[in-house]
């Protein structure tokens, strides 16, 4: 075991093309402050000693520094992202290796709570699991698509939607990210599973922990923030 604190990687290097803004969604205002400020603060509250790495596009660094100066916000250390989320996470792990525990979180999920962060860490604390993921139940009906054939209904109770943060044994995660990229890597857990580290615990997530994807999501996130403040 190392004596390094927990490593938190917040991935905020995406372009957010579906959001329809001049700047990536993780930097747009949410209740007057950039979206990505919120998860950084949640991790600082939950784990004051954690080392936080923010992964951003090089083209956004000037904007980020300006936003921090404007709001009096202390920036975590910065790593430049790659062309894909997988590359961005790999860059962060490569820049700051050797941690026993690593959290990976989407910078566009502003409503993560310290409680969820702590519950995920507790699920991993006994050292037996490779990782832990927050999940929420599906509420819509879902159908399975077949090439050239009609779609079929499936039992949604057998499926879960996966959120972030995802937390892992840091040494196993670093090993997994040495694998060559595969289109099957839909999240960090899928990278771990490809490396044979498949003892992944599912933890009850939070339906409010939405990912900002479209313009209307900002209004929904603001609603949740306003309600939490009452």
Residue spans of the language-model regions?
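Conserved alpha/beta core of the MobA/IspD/sugar-nucleotide pyrophosphorylase nucleotidyltransferase superfamily
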Residues: 2, 160-230
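N-terminal glycine-rich phosphate-binding loop and ensuing alpha1 helix
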Residues: 2-62
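Residue-level signal for inorganic ion chemistry
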Residues: 10, 36, 92, 105-106, ...
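Hydrophobic packing residues within well-ordered alpha-helices of enzyme cores
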Residues: 19, 64-68, 120, 142, ...
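Short helix-capping segments at alpha-helix termini
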Residues: 45-48, 69-75, 127-128
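Short active-site oxyanion
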Residues: 49-53, 75-76, 130-131, 178, ...
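Conserved beta-loop-beta/alpha segment of the NTase-like Rossmann-fold superfamily
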Residues: 75-77, 83-149, 163-164
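A recurrent flexible, glycine/aromatic-enriched loop bordering the glycosyltransferase active site
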Residues: 152-162
């Amino acid at each position: 075991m190392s004596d390094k604190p927990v490593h938190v990687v917040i991935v905020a290097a995406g372009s957010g093309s579906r959001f329809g803004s001049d700047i990536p969604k993780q930097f747009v205002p949410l209740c007057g402050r950039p979206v990505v400020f919120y998860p950084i603060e949640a991790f600082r509250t939950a784990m004051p000693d954690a080392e936080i790495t923010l992964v951003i596009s090089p083209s956004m660094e000037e904007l980020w520094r300006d936003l921090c100066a404007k709001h009096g916000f202390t920036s975590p250390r910065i790593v430049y992202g790659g062309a894909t989320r997988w590359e961005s996470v790999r860059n962060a792990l490569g820049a700051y290796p050797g941690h026993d525990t690593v959290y990976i979180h989407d910078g566009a999920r502003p409503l993560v709570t310290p409680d969820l962060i702590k519950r995920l860490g507790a699920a991993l604390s006994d050292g037996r699991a490779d990782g832990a993921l927050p999940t929420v139940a599906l509420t819509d009906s879902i159908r399975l698509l077949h090439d050239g054939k009609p779609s079929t209904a499936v039992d949604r109770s057998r499926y879960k939607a996966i959120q972030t943060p995802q937390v892992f044994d840091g040494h196993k995660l670093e090993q997994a990210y040495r694998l060559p990229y595969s289109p099957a890597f839909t999240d960090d857990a899928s990278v771990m599973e490809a490396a044979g580290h498949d003892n992944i615990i599912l933890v009850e997530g939070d339906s409010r922990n939405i990912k900002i994807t479209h313009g209307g999501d900002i209004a929904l996130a603001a609603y949740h923030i306003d309600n939490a403040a009452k």
